[in-house]
Each structure stands twice: as C-alpha cells, then as structure tokens.
UniProtKB/Swiss-Prot annotation:
Keywords: Cytoplasm, NAD, Oxidoreductase, Phosphoprotein. Changing R109A: About 65-fold loss of catalytic efficiency. GO terms for biological process: 9-cis-retinoic acid biosynthetic process; L-kynurenine catabolic process; retinal metabolic process; retinoic acid metabolic process. The record marks N155 as: Transition state stabilizer. It catalyses: 2-aminomuconate 6-semialdehyde + NAD(+) + H2O = (2Z,4E)-2-aminomuconate + NADH + 2 H(+). Transmembrane segments: none annotated. This is 2-aminomuconic semialdehyde dehydrogenase. It is found in: Cytoplasm. Belongs to the aldehyde dehydrogenase family. It is an enzyme of class 1 (oxidoreductase). The modification Phosphoserine is found at S362. The active site is at E253 (proton acceptor), C287 (nucleophile).
Amino acid sequence: MAGTNALLMLENFIDGKFLPCSSYIDSYDPSTGEVYCRVPNSGKDEIEAAVKAAREAFPSWSSRSPQERSRVLNQVADLLEQSLEEFAQAESKDQGKTLALARTMDIPRSVQNFRFFASSSLHHTSECTQMDHLGCMHYTVRAPVGVAGLISPWNLPLYLLTWKIAPAMAAGNTVIAKPSELTSVTAWMLCKLLDKAGVPPGVVNIVFGTGPRVGEALVSHPEVPLISFTGSQPTAERITQLSAPHCKKLSLELGGKNPAIIFEDANLDECIPATVRSSFANQGEICLCTSRIFVQKSIYSEFLKRFVEATRKWKVGIPSDPLVSIGALISKAHLEKVRSYVKRALAEGAQIWCGEGVDKLSLPARNQAGYFMLPTVITDIKDESCCMTEEIFGPVTCVVPFDSEEEVIERANNVKYGLAATVWSSNVGRVHRVAKKLQSGLVWTNCWLIRELNLPFGGMKSSGIGREGAKDSYDFFTEIKTITVKH
C-alpha cells in the first residue's frame, strides 16, 4: 500500500485481501535508527478472522492433487525470482543485512524453498505390510493436519518464513503466518504475489504484530492444531505452555552456542576465511553462527594472529555498499545486549583482540544512529563464562586453546545447546569420530553452511524439538493413519 507521511504502511493479508488494523507499531531502519515503516499491531480479532478463512479454504486446498499444489508453488517461485532485486533491496533495508547477502542468499533461498517443496511433495511413498496367516494387509496414508500456525524470526525473514509456508502448503494445509514485527516487509510483499500465482483466498494468511498479542492468540487458538516456530528458547517455553492444553503438534527450532574445533592438521588457508564467515556472516545473527572456537595449542598463536587479521578485513558499514561485509544489527536493544556481553567478558578478565572498544568504527553522518558493531574476537575466557555458554547472536566470537581430542569434545558439549558444530582436520578418521561424539544436530567438517535440503535440519538439547527438511517437514505437516484390510 502507499506510504503515509513517507512511511510504508503494512496491512494484514486475510482471506486473499489486504485489511487495515486499528493500531500500528513502528518499525525501524537498522542502518539509520529511523522509523520508516508501520506494522499492524494485530490481536485476537485478526487471528479469529484468519482462522475462519483458513478453515474455510482447507477442504478445497487439501483435496487438490499434489501435482496441482506443486504447480501453484512453482508459480510463486517464478514470480518471486522475477522480483528478486526488489525483494533483496527491501530485505536489506528492513533487517540491516548487506544487500549482497540478501541478493545471493536470502531471496534465492526463498525461491528455492518453494521450488524444492513443490518437487519433493511429488515423491513421497507409503508403507505396506501383509499378514498372510491372518489374511490381512496393512498400509499407511498421510493427510494434511489442517490450519498450520507458523511463526518466523527476524534474522532471515523471508528465507525462514518460506521454509515453513512452502512445505505446509505442499502437504495440503492452510496457513496462518506471523512474521517478526521487526522485519515484516518482505512477508507483506510476498502476499502480493500469492494471488497472481493462483493461491486461493484463505490458503495463506499473514497476520502482523507482536508475540505477546498476536503470537499468543495464534498459538492458543483451539482450531490451530499445529505450530512451527523458529526463535528464542524463552518464547518456545511460552509456546509449549500455551499449546499443552490442546496437545498441538510442535516444531521448535531454537538457538545455538555452536563450536568450531580446529585441530593442528587443519588447512588454515581454508579454515580461517571460512571461520571468519561462520562467526560474522549476517552480523552473527544466524542460529548456525560460530561463537566458540577451540584451537589446538600447537597452532593457537598462529591461528589467532591470522584470524584477527582476517576479521579486521571485514568492513562494517552501509548495507547497500558492495564493499561492506557486515551491516547493521536488528535493533538498538539488541545492539546494547550484544555489547553487554563484551563488557561482561572484560570484567571477567578476558582480552579483546579486535572490534568493540578496540577499533574505531567510521560511519557517514546519516548512519551515526544506526545499530552497527565491529566484529569482535575475545580470548582468555573461561568455559563457564556467559560469553561461552549463552547465545549472543551478534558479531562476537571467543577463541580458546585445547590439548586433546577427548578434552575438546567434552568442552564443546558442555553447554545446554546442540544445534551445529564445525570440525577442521585433514584426518578423515578423526572428523568422522569427532562428528559422531558431538551433541549437535548438524556437524560440518572442513566447511560451513553447505546445506542439502533433503536431509534433516534441527538441533539437540535446548536447541529445539523436531527436524525440518523434505521428509521431516512432510511428516510434520501431515498426520499418519494405519489402515488394515482383512480379505
């Protein structure tokens, strides 16, 4: 919709129509600290309308063949790809990430999400067994669950929203999605493409607002039997409490405190640039980012020197600048939270090698109030420190030495999270051995963030419940039924 007083005004998308809201909240451009957008402050009334629309659309959408639904998803992908630059510009402005990253990762992956699930939904099979001595045959069928409640985070806004919408739609469900109120623009833009792609009214409803108001209304609604959430552990605990009385299906993808383990036989020419990227990509605002780096003592000094030098080459600045590697953090509150971890580390006697409080950040006048922070490397810190145990979710990483394989495995596992890890070594036997012992849902060896969407994604321990991916997402968004026929 058109802006008012130069502000972009978003509207909810319910039953195929854009609808205004009675109240709005401000959304800020992270690179300037200025309000540039107003987001609906939705609540129970908007959720009731969305549930009604989704329930009414469900019988028709769920009865379509997988091939018909696949065609619609592919059409959404085509339209999104045609608008890639427009979406990338919007994502960068709304989230603070570099335009280069939005162009090369966020929006292309969003396109791929629709195409991937459009294809994978055509290749599922069912089980069948026979009990000849009883004259019985057993087989399974899967059916869509119904109305899917989807809650996505602010760090990869469209990327993770489509990672939920696409499999839910492909399986035959209808959707009520709630993006983060901090990054709602590309979700709103996506709504404009749905009708063009042939998505029937009510199949996808997107309701904007805060977690305590609209999020809780969605999660607690008795006619929304399934919730898929990506975000923080405290919010997941609240979702679990609200869902328990209704026995809802839950998929919870939460935080991480991801270790990188670098053995003395690692190829540092490959390891160092990859570990800088895994530590600071997207301002460190990726649940898979590395925030604990364990380096074998014999190469610790060399690694640290080269790692700090490489980190300092990552330029922080205006997200649209093609030479910039790190944009702005999501909000002023989050920036202060990340900075507070560095202050606490200093109070504990840690050393800061580069970044916050050490190097000077130079920004244009217009961006002085933006939420920028230099990539920061911390050493001389204990494993029990908050910087080594809590998810910081910013451009901060800790580098510590280790002696033996057994020691580093124990230390790497000594946190409540278990999402991802990386292992660097030229010893093939070692990387297999260590990967199996790490309490992580994903382990990369001699690489980072290479994803195969057919395989499970998700974490152990406090990093979540369930897995996402081709088969796992299909299983989550469907209910299985066993049928026995006596002949």
